[in-house]
Amino acid sequence: MTGLFDPLTVRGLTLRNRIGVAPMCQGTSTDGHVNDWHLVHLGARALGGAALVMFEAAGVTPEGRISTRDAGLWDDAQIEGYVRVNRFISAAGAASAIQLGHAGRKSSFRPIWAAQGMQGLRVATSAEGGWTAAGPSAIPFDTDTAQPRAMSDEEICAVPAQFARAAQRAEAAGFDWIEVHAAHGYLLHSFLSPISNLRTDGWGGSFDNRIRLCLETARAIRAVWPERKPLAFRLSYTDWVEGGWTLDESVELSRRLREAGVDLIDASSGGTTPAATNLARHMTTRALDGQARGREDGALRAQIPLGPGYQVPGAEAIRSGADILVAAVGLITDPTQADAIVREGRADMVMLARELLRDPNWPIRAALALGQAARMSIPCQYYLAWSDRGGSRFDPVAPET
């Protein structure tokens, strides 16, 4: 029976275990360039035993970033910074991944550490480097976010090529794995959801029209991304609101993504509307007869059943319904819990976020807790810290020269 510390092979890449570092925006980049923070932040998690170490969402255009301080991969000049970090991740025995994204209407924010009060991220001013956000329709995410403009057909048609060019840069930077961000209300997800996509042309309305941009993006990336390297998509499998994107739709989209060359679905949820904990009211704007008319949807907000492993059922449904590899993510914090998710066939791997922020060495501790220390590579430089805890396999990590 496959467990958390069994290797996982996807195309030509074999991961040393089934623990991944989920992408987490750090708000530390300047003009999209990664720096020493990313080297230390991600390098520590590679040394801590994770098999897949994923960079934060990198904007495929400057306007595709969530915040003004997020990473990017829209310019060749940004490649070298990633190369340096990837060399260290590889030396530590992990595989490097990058999440490529376009934030769409949920962009041009101040970095999360600069947000004021309890209402979430604030829109960056032009003086702070902000821009006018754009999405499928002119519908703001919330009352404290700016109203985006609706994208033109020409702008939408350009998106797959923007992702493909970023994928080529990811290859030049030495990445082993690409994940496309099609979740959390960002651009690709906003086309999927009827809540945020009110278009009446070939990009909206029917299911086939709403998934069109996702599929075209997947095909464009697969055409330039090496055949031996995995391609994943992060999906929000439900919006958690009536009339939104559904699990059944996610299963069908996952089938079609698999046919387009996608290897794994990173199954998350939500993000199209504010969560119930956000006190702001959700507003939508519908273009009707050429006039922009406001429509208040009352307290339209996601009712998310937060709890340990709350998104695992969605991952399991996609795995069985679409016959594709899946990663489970969301409030996975306990080694026994994570191991059971894999052993019970509910997911093929787990992605940890905040738990790995709290403890970069969580994989090592999990291996010890599960009696799998012999299968965990621990840096020999840390021998004294782990030898008396049951660690038995130590590998050197060569410093950069």
Please place each PLM-identified region on the residue numbering:
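Flavin-dependent oxidoreductase catalytic cores
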Residues: 1-401
